[in-house]
Amino acid sequence: MVTKFSVWRDQAEYRIAIARLRGVRRADLDQNDLFKARQELQVYLATRAEGARREEARIALRECEEKLAESEYLIGEFYRIIGQHFGALLHYELAITNYPAAKYTVEAERRVDELARASKSETPPKPAESAPTAP
């Protein structure tokens, strides 16, 4: 049994977070386990200053955040494909804002630029300022 004062607690807290992270098969389907894994890894790093697995926990936290960025990007792709540009932009922006170091952030920024260019080219021409008068 692992108690608050157990010598195994450090290892147990790390392994619980890693098990949750490794259990995620597809980042785009369910973010709940990714959010829980991230939280557990952050708690481990915050409370285990002398933890034996700190470096592995940092690496796992980066992996977790990469998967969360991937999730936001893929959800944005879904919305873009079905023509819901507002939803696409929302999820691309979440990837960019929440996970700036992730590789999917670059792709999300590229998609935001593409959608911005597309929306500019789709805007209707402005009406004439003054209508011609009839003779």
Question: Where do the protein language model's features map onto the residues?
Answer:
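Acidic, polar-rich low-complexity tracts and alpha-helical solenoid repeat scaffolds
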Residues: 1-135
